[in-house]
Amino acid sequence: MKIIVDMMGGDNAPLAVLEGAAQAVKEYGVNVVGVGDEALVRRTAQENSIPLDGIELVNCTEVIDMCDEPARAIRQKKDSSIVVGLNMLKDGKGDAFVSAGSTGALHVGASLIVRTLKGIKRPALATMVPAKKQAYLLLDCGANVECRPEMLAAFAVMGSCYVNRVEGRRSPSVALANNGAEESKGTPMLKEAHQLLKTTPGIRFVGNIEPRDVPGGKVDVVVCDGFTGNVILKLTEGVAKMLLGMLKQMFLANLGGKLAYLLLKGSVADLKHQMDSEEYGGAPFLGARQPVIKAHGSSKAKGIKNAIRQAKICVENDLCGTMQSALDELAAAQKTEE
């Protein structure tokens, strides 16, 4: 299996990307095709004693920066690591693509270069979010700011497939993010989406979920538009950071706090592990014809390694093929209703 990796994407590239790729080759038995400035990558590997066994390098001369306008960058920077990597994926020179680069450019590239599954106009950005009971899949978390009810139904279908195939959960539950649990709550679009989700085949829809209940992790998939999802995601990240900071202040405040830390050290470590986004890999663009994984921009080696693991699982379980079959069933059901 070949995983194409953008060596130039992210705040810590190429060192962290190279380290993560090398670890993935060793731990998961995949082959990596690294796309980027070959001379820089080789020099980085040599200076940091990182083996290139199992890593094939493909040279390119451009990088899409975070400040670049996504659509223009995809059109104009043809020799960038993202464009070259996505074209390689489209041409069958790899099985999946992983990048910690520009989210917008990846979204545009996944849509225009890799193309989308039948019935999907634009892929949804999905991510596993830590929660009290268990992590849940949130989609869309930023790619599609405005959505129609039919899009949310498609997101629900794809999200269910992902949680089942990648996370191994049978009959995953799906909820619609809303400002109230009652069917009558929400905007006209959300009310219509609720009714549509009730009759969507292939999913176990459990109704609306209020934002205060989302962190409980009682459902497997939370569906929403990209604006709402991005707010939920960033608020969750902020609260997690705040709580860990408050715990640290409490433990360092006095001798009693330091003694308490010694007693709770293992539990605190478990909590940090559970809330570490790098443990969950990256955010897949669900709806692309082949797996495209967006690693966090600040990813270190562990985050890149786990994003590659995530891509491997998607390929092994034929996630895209499974989603297409489910979307075909959805389209057939909607046609029958018409």
Segments from the language model and where they lie:
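N-terminal phosphate-binding or glycine-rich loops at protein starts, especially the Walker A/P-loop
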Residues: 1-42
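Short, glycine-rich nucleotide/cofactor-binding loops
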Residues: 5-14, 143-153, 294-301
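Short glycine/serine/threonine-rich phosphate/pyrophosphate-binding segments
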Residues: 13-17, 79-92, 96-110, 117, ...
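Glycine-rich phosphate/diphosphate-binding loop of Rossmann-like nucleotide-binding domains
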Residues: 15-16, 31-33, 39, 145-207, ...
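Short helix-capping segments at alpha-helix termini
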Residues: 25-28, 46-54, 167, 197-203
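Phosphate/nucleotide-donor binding subsite
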Residues: 49-94
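Glycine-rich phosphate/nucleotide-binding loop
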Residues: 111-124, 130-138, 218-222, 226-336
